[in-house]
Amino acid sequence: ISAVSFFDEIEDQMIIDALKVAKVKGRVERVPVPYNYTLIIDYAHNALSMENVLETLRQYNPHRLITMFGAGGNRPKVRRYEMGETSGRLSDLSVVTEDNSRFEDVMDIIEDIKTGLAKTDGKYVVVPNRRDAIKYCMDNAEDGDIIVLAGKGHEDYQEIKGVKYHMDEREIIADILNGKS
């Protein structure tokens, strides 16, 4: 901090105060909802990033930690197994859905994720359509829950068969809250 303030003649406290409110879209991004649960969008798209965010959120002692996620197609299958195992171990409920399936079948990807989940005692449901999965999470939320929509983060598209379709989780959440979904 001192190096930055020295060159730019900015007070250290100004930098500290700014860092306290700095936010990065899609990284532990809290989406306001008019209910007594917490809804978070995060870009966690591999086991390590998922583990980091879930272990951190677990420290808040939620009623339940619910993780909705999928895995990208045309990527190493081991990532799917690892993500399933990580979510199964750290979440009270995993909601398995689609992500950027690219040129792979969504259900094949989901089956690979389930292989990882099977290594744990974790509860899970499969909701193949991501919009429906978000609605499922919100409809089944209980007071004190933390819901993590993992994998998309800042992305506002879904890639399927070489085409990027507009899909912004923030817009989907707003539609659900407004009764449009």
Feature roles, as predicted:
Residues 2-181:
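ATP-dependent carboxylate-amine ligase
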